[in-house]
Amino acid sequence: MGLRLSEEKTKIVHIDEGFDFLGMHIQRHKKLGADRRFVYTYPSRAALAAVKAKVRTACRGTTNQSLSDLLKRLNPILRGWTNYHRHGAASKTFSYLTAFTWRRVWIWLRGKHPKATVKELRRRYLPGWHPQQDEVRMFYPDTVAIVRYRYRGAAIASPWATKDTAA
């Protein structure tokens, strides 16, 4: 039982070129305003394309249902994807996904009520330009906080440390 690497599945690249792994694109960049280079993890383009396809399919051909049913289908998709990708440099991607989803919901509303004016749609479904109905509100991915883990050094903090022993 030995380890064999498949040449079709294995790829060796330089970190400056970047690579995709588990839905993230990992690449080293020069930080703006600094001379040092840092490794960043972004959501990969394939992962973004996949979630956009899920949003499109959720909005396609369902105008016979209510807006709250659409939002109940969309919100778990968006929450799950953003919670998975919130540990990388994803704030611009989250803003883009928010705009994309809002646009798809707007197109869905225009298809559901083709003769309604923008003012009527806004009054009925978009209070403050936030899609909602029956206490169900659209989830905005750009409101998710980006959480990164800090390097703590070689010493791991003891969970049993008291104020006296921590010093």
Give the ranges of each region predicted by the language model:
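Non-catalytic terminal/accessory segments
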Residues: 1-167
